[in-house]
Amino acid sequence: MTEVQQTEKVTPRLKTKYREEIRGRLQEQFQYGNVMQVPGLVKVVVNMGVGEAAKDSKIIDDAVTDLTAITGQKPMITKARKSIAQFKLREGMPIGTHATLRGDRMWEFLDRLVTLPLPRIRDFRGLSDRQFDGNGNYTFGLSEQTVFHEIDQDKIDRVRGMDITVVTTAKNDDEGRALLKALGFPFKTDQ
């Protein structure tokens, strides 16, 4: 008989911090009667628009490779919904790629994002706190994929930016801002 080795599942560091410290602090701060009212994270969507892929299909493959290395899962390819003659775009052509992260992958990605890539950005003074959508969700853009240490700078063919959306259960922007600040997001202090 062969023995099946049981590997112990490790809870992501940021998730543990949220459960043990942040949730209690937010419950006190906003005077929630129930712990389930405390805002939490739902998902993180990483989107990479690749408009040049309409002309050259190899470009989308490179974008998929980069996003796979960054997020740790294979992204979906976004296709054009309509044909637009001015952009030489036909319906069904690949124009971008996105990955939706949930669960432990989401927590690990956010932990890596806050600790490594954001401080590596040149002239970085913090994230703008004006990019909330009114419902506690936060979207920001990165201008290049090389800030992630998973990307080998010698092997990139072109610089690609990406949008990162953090979806929360917060009811308004103040709750969302408090949650993300507690998770370690570096917001600008003076406007």
Swiss-Prot record:
GO cellular component: ribonucleoprotein complex; ribosome
Assigned keywords, A-Z: Ribonucleoprotein, Ribosomal protein, RNA-binding, rRNA-binding, tRNA-binding
GO biological process: translation
Quaternary data: Part of the 50S ribosomal subunit; part of the 5S rRNA/L5/L18/L25 subcomplex. Contacts the 5S rRNA and the P site tRNA. Forms a bridge to the 30S subunit in the 70S ribosome.
One MF term in the entry's GO annotations: tRNA binding
Organism per entry: Micrococcus luteus (Micrococcus lysodeikticus)
HAMAP family: Ribosomal_uL5_B
Functional summary from the UniProt entry: This is one of the proteins that bind and probably mediate the attachment of the 5S RNA into the large ribosomal subunit, where it forms part of the central protuberance. In the 70S ribosome it contacts protein S13 of the 30S subunit (bridge B1b), connecting the 2 subunits; this bridge is implicated in subunit movement. Contacts the P site tRNA; the 5S rRNA and some of its associated proteins might help stabilize positioning of ribosome-bound tRNAs.
Gene: rplE
Family assignment from sequence similarity: Belongs to the universal ribosomal protein uL5 family.
Signal peptide: none
Protein name as annotated: Large ribosomal subunit protein uL5
